[in-house]
């Protein structure tokens, strides 16, 4: 496995062969299986939100924030679906994980799921680019190994979606059996699917999975777990980044500019230096993004 050569190849817009991709996926699974459900990460590190198959914009993200391994990254899931280059996005992230395992942390998002990828594009894309479903199978097997959250210097929790009524302490996240398809309910599901809302406690989510959670829930969770902040992604933010609640105890980071090639939003990444001081970097879409057409099919999001 010549990882450096493969990285150059994928950055140049080529695909790995089916056999190379299989080898890479098996290799990365061996790294991921060692990671905790709450993977400890040291600052300095840069936190990123959804990418959704926008490969050229991911390349711009690295130009904006610095390249691995000079910059350490946490990607909070939703690498695939919706954009037209999910395969390239997931492949390059796997290659960087294989080459620099200590410098990049990949969290699972609700789209890292066999079920959703068959509806929202990744399955069809793999079929189109490889002529069969093997590549999709290799990648979706890796999904089951991805960790659920990361904690920066013990004080900032990163998770794709949000909180769960079944998770009061971070230790409860450590106990989840993660090596499976995302369940339809329960704590694992909630971490992937929940959203913050301007309420006090809990409410039913319009997404049909996870919960809406409010200010008091978030403040209590942070207090009990000695956290300064919960970082999450999962929701489009027109301005790229949004703090929630009076105490700003939660932030949404969104890293797919001009989402779906038509939303007109900016993207952001959130950097923490060695003193845990924060810096937001914003970026807009690439020329390639602008040349893409709008979505081919109007599949409604609420399942």
UniProtKB/Swiss-Prot annotation:
Site (described: Required for catalytic activity): 81
Family assignment from sequence similarity: Belongs to the PPP phosphatase family. PP-6 (PP-V) subfamily.
Subcellular location: Cytoplasm
Key words, A-Z: Cytoplasm, Hydrolase, Manganese, Metal-binding, Protein phosphatase, Zinc
Phenotypic consequence of residue 81 to N: Almost abolishes catalytic activity
InterPro entries in the record: Calcineurin-like_PHP_ApaH, Metallo-depent_PP-like, PPA2-like, Ser/Thr-sp_prot-phosphatase
Origin species: Arabidopsis thaliana (Mouse-ear cress)
Record text on cofactor binding: Binds 2 zinc ions per subunit.
Record-listed Zn(2+) 1 binding positions: 50, 52, 78
Name by which UniProt lists this protein: Phytochrome-associated serine/threonine-protein phosphatase 3
Purpose of the protein: Catalytic subunit of protein phosphatase 6 (PP6). Dephosphorylates phosphorylated phytochromes, with a preference toward Pfr forms. Plays a major role in the photoperiodic control of flowering time in long days by modulating phytochrome signals in flowering time control. Involved in the regulation of polar auxin transport in roots. Dephosphorylates directly the auxin efflux carriers PIN1 and PIN2, thus promoting their proper polar localization in root cell plasma membrane.
This protein's GO CC annotations: cytoplasm; nucleus; protein phosphatase type 2A complex
Pfam families: Metallophos
Binding site for Zn(2+) 2: 78, 110, 160, 234
Enzymatic reactions: O-phospho-L-seryl-[protein] + H2O = L-seryl-[protein] + phosphate; O-phospho-L-threonyl-[protein] + H2O = L-threonyl-[protein] + phosphate
GO molecular function terms attached to this record: protein serine/threonine kinase activity; protein serine/threonine phosphatase activity; zinc ion binding
GO biological process: negative regulation of flower development; protein dephosphorylation
Expressing tissues: Mostly expressed in flowers. Also detected to a lower extent in stems and leaves. Expressed in roots.
PANTHER family for the chain: SERINE/THREONINE-PROTEIN PHOSPHATASE PP2A-RELATED
Cofactor requirement: Zn(2+)
Top-level division of the source organism's lineage: Eukaryota
Positions annotated as active site in the UniProt record: 111 (proton donor)
Highest classification ranks of the organism: Eukaryota, Viridiplantae, Streptophyta, Embryophyta, Tracheophyta
Residues in coiled coil: none
CDD domains tied to this protein: MPP_PP2A_PP4_PP6
Subunit description: Interacts with PHYA and PHYB, mostly when they are phosphorylated and in Pfr forms. Interacts with TAP46. Interacts with NRP. Interacts with PIN1 and PIN2. Interacts with ABI5. Interacts with PIF3 and PIF4. Protein phosphatase 6 (PP6) holoenzyme is a heterotrimeric complex formed by the catalytic subunit FYPP, a SAPS domain-containing subunit (SAL) and a protein phosphatase 2A regulatory subunit A (PP2AA).
Effect of gene knockout: Early flowering. No visible phenotype under normal growth conditions, but the double mutant plants fypp1 and fypp3 exhibit severe developmental defects in roots and leaves, and show defective gravitropism.
């Amino acid at each position: 496995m010549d990882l450096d050569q493969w990285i150059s190849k994928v950055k140049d817009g080529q695909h790995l062969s089916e056999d190379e991709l299989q080898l890479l996926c098996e290799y990365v699974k061996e790294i991921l299986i060692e990671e905790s459900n709450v993977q400890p990460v040291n600052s300095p590190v840069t936190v990123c939100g959804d990418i959704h198959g926008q490969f050229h914009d991911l390349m711009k993200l690295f130009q904006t924030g610095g390249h691995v391994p000079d910059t350490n990254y946490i990607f909070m899931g939703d690498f695939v679906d919706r954009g037209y280059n999910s395969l390239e996005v997931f492949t390059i992230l796997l290659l960087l994980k294989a080459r620099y395992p200590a410098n990049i942390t990949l969290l699972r998002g609700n789209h890292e799921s066999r079920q959703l990828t068959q509806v929202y594009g990744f399955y069809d894309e793999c079929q189109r680019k490889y002529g069969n479903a093997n590549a999709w199978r290799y990648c979706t097997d890796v999904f089951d190994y991805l960790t659920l959250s990361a904690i920066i210097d013990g004080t900032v929790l990163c998770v794709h979606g949000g909180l769960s009524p079944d998770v009061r302490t971070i230790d409860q996240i450590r106990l989840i059996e993660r090596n499976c398809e995302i369940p339809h309910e329960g704590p694992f599901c909630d971490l992937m699917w929940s959203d913050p809302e301007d309420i006090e406690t809990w409410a039913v989510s319009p997404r049909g999975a996870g919960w809406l959670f409010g200010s008091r829930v978030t403040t209590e969770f942070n207090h009990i777990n000695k956290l300064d902040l919960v970082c999450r992604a999962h929701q489009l933010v027109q301005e790229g980044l949004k703090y929630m609640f009076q105490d700003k105890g939660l932030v949404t980071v969104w890293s797919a500019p001009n989402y779906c090639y038509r939303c007109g939003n900016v993207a952001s990444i959130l950097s923490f230096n060695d003193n845990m001081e924060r810096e937001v970097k914003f970026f807009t879409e690439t020329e390639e993004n602008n040349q893409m057409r709008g979505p081919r099919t109007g599949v409604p999001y609420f399942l």
